[in-house]
Amino acid sequence: MDFEASARDLTTPVKGAKIVPNMSVDELVREYAGCAFGAGRLAEAVDIYYEMLASEKTTKFFGLAGAMTPAGMRGIIADLIRDGHIDVLVTTGANMVHDTVEALGLHHYKGSDCANDIQLRHECIDRIYDVYLPDQHFTDLEEFLQSVYAGLPQEKLSIRQVLTEIGKNLDDDSSILKTAAEMGVPVYCPALQDSVIGLQAWLYKEGNLLHVDAFADMHEFMEICYEAESAGAMLLGGGVPKNYILQSMLVTPKSFDYAIQLTMDRPETGGLSGATLDEAQSWGKVGEDAKSVTVYADATITLPLIVSAVRTRLSKR
């Protein structure tokens, strides 16, 4: 961000978007580039993400927070992994829970945010805003997880290794965990305990041998950061995934060269999820000359647009 900009810098007029029939998403985004506010930021995010993915020397980190998998974003992320556009994924446990639910053929359903939640409770239906999930799905998920844990090696494992083993037991090409396991892309989940996957691991451990070292992934993750010639981060939401990605670079002499944040959170409360990427520069997490932008909008809207536009540009290289 240029804090020295002033009213004297009247060099770039706002250009209204021109919408014509049969436009591609990339053509629409290019029209956004002449606009201000969120439209201009979205166009900037596409430019940065394209440069980040096109760079062969850049290690690409992806932070996944929020309820992205129940909302229908898992296939997009699985495709990004499959196409080599994600080198490292850091996620919440909940996103991997819902990814596994779908991979087992246990669907989420479109519902209503105006539902009678007491009635839903009586009908054994859980609500995630306007998404419904039957309680029975969790019973089926728990049985699957217990069978996976029973087949794990009886040695010290990292959380990443546990998630890889879960992915190996799934058969769904839209699954994030399955695709990551197939492609050899590490999936890190620093707060796995805060999910059904973690809860079921604890329940299994109560009566069986299971040794998961919560710190084991850090050495591996730091090595990736050290070895990165250049680093870029796409951050959906904030929370643990965002901080885990950004703080790890502090251990190295480097900073992130590219950073994109898709969030609805505000910076005024001081929470990490709303903290700006400019603020991250004060910590040395994002480089002084980094290309970065925060897009304040629902990531279920912005992520598909960004990925679609960037894919079009990459196909024309």
From Swiss-Prot:
Pathway(s) per entry: Protein modification; eIF5A hypusination
GO molecular function, one term: deoxyhypusine synthase activity
Entry superkingdom: Archaea
Annotated active site: 285 (nucleophile)
First-level EC class: transferase
Cofactor: NAD(+)
InterPro entries registered for this protein in UniProt: Deoxyhypus_synthase_arc, Deoxyhypusine_synthase, Deoxyhypusine_synthase_sf, DHS-like_NAD/FAD-binding_dom
Keyword tags: Hypusine biosynthesis, NAD, Transferase
EC number(s) given by UniProt: 2.5.1.46
Keyword NAD included in the entry's annotation: yes
GO CC, one annotated term: cytoplasm
SUPFAM superfamilies found in the cross-reference section: DHS-like NAD/FAD-binding domain (SSF52467)
BP-aspect Gene Ontology terms: spermidine metabolic process
Catalytic reactions on record: [eIF5A protein]-L-lysine + spermidine = [eIF5A protein]-deoxyhypusine + propane-1,3-diamine
Entry's family note: Belongs to the deoxyhypusine synthase family.
Biological function: Catalyzes the NAD-dependent oxidative cleavage of spermidine and the subsequent transfer of the butylamine moiety of spermidine to the epsilon-amino group of a specific lysine residue of the eIF-5A precursor protein to form the intermediate deoxyhypusine residue.
Protein's recorded name: Probable deoxyhypusine synthase 1
The organism of origin for this protein: Methanosarcina acetivorans (strain ATCC 35395 / DSM 2834 / JCM 12185 / C2A)
Lineage: Archaea, Methanobacteriati, Methanobacteriota, Stenosarchaea group, Methanomicrobia
